[in-house]
């Protein structure tokens, strides 16, 4: 798995999603799942996320909107952590959910809101 694009992607992925999560995903890859891990790390993180056109905060907000539209709650939860790591506030995230409610549908936004509420409760309980 070692090449320059992979290493760059791995670094960005760790910075955004957290090293513990990423390292576990990569280390648990087997012959079946490794090709997808490589693809995601190299092209999603090493190529697209590394581009200079948008900052990471903006990319995180866009991801949350798209994942809400696609109704992908597991990915929403993962990218909520990334959004915080990239400087997004709880208010920024709520604004994305309000925007998606109008353009993607209230049910999709409500599902993401439930995920976000649970996520923020976990984060806040760890801070106490």
For every predicted segment, state its role.
Residues 33, 70, 104-105, 120:
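A short hydrophobic/aromatic micro-motif that marks alpha-helical segments and, especially, helix-coil
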Residues 106-110:
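Substrate/cofactor-recognition hotspot
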Residues 61-64, 68-95:
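Mid-chain, well-packed structural core segment of small domains
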Residues 1-57, 85, 111-128:
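Acidic, glycine/proline-rich low-complexity segments that act as flexible tails and inter-domain linkers
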């Amino acid at each position: 798995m070692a090449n320059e694009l992979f290493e760059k992607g791995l670094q960005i992925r760790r910075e955004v999603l957290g090293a513990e999560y990423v390292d576990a995903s990569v280390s648990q890859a087997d012959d079946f799942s490794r090709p997808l891990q490589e693809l995601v790390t190299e092209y999603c993180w090493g190529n697209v996320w590394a581009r200079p056109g948008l900052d990471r905060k903006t990319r995180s907000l866009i991801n949350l909107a798209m994942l809400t539209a696609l109704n992908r709650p597991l990915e929403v939860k993962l990218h909520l952590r990334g959004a915080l790591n990239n400087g997004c506030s709880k208010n920024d995230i709520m604004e994305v959910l309000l925007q998606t409610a109008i353009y993607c549908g209230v049910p999709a936004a409500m599902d993401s809101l439930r995920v976000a509420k649970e996520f923020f409760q976990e984060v806040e309980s760890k801070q106490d």
